[in-house]
Amino acid sequence: MDTEKIPRRFEFARDSFAFANELVWEYLPDAVTGKTMMVARDPKPEYAHRCFALVRVARQFFYHARFAADQPEASGEACRRLMRAVMARSVRIRCQPHERIVIPGFPGLREFSRTHEKLIKAECGGAWRSYFLRSHWRMIFPFSRAHQTRTAEALITALGRNHLPILHLVKFPALSINHAIILFGVTDTRQGWEFESYDPNNSVASERLMFDRGTRAFILPANACWPGGQLDVSHICRSCFF
């Protein structure tokens, strides 16, 4: 029986995957032009284009699973059934504590995915899950500064309710970024807000996303797949339209 009375907060070291979504391209700065060059990775990655799939499943585990490290670990086939049961749940609505699916033998998703990496990668699905999403229609329309301000405010409200907002990061019509992350914390700063995020491309540490109240824009610092700078944010997996 789940005796959870106070909803626990997302913890990167416990609630993220032990493996990363691999990058197809390596992003390198050009010393002459200052621009970022894209160089194909060699050897070709075996597990890429799964960012949307990974953030979706990470949230499903946070919303619908309870890990029980004090119980005997389930067999591989039993773990597969548990994995599928979690993935069959809503990605948008959290279940009641007593309805959570118990995952025995592990303290959290990180250790579960470390032990059953191959199984979990297979069950999360192929790269197509990152391309065929109902929310992708939004990226072709302009993102106004007022819209981005409202989005930032809505994200703060969601985090205050212990939700895990999933964001689609875009720079449309440029194709320089098409990525998904999860937010799990926010800090008020002099310039605006600094959000703490789980980026499925990074299994080592959490990352940051800033919102500048002056420019009314989101700013993502440079990382393995982005040279740094302003981009647009769409809050997805939150309604029947997203």
Model feature map: region roles:
Residues 79-87, 180, 208, 222:
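Short alpha-helical interface elements
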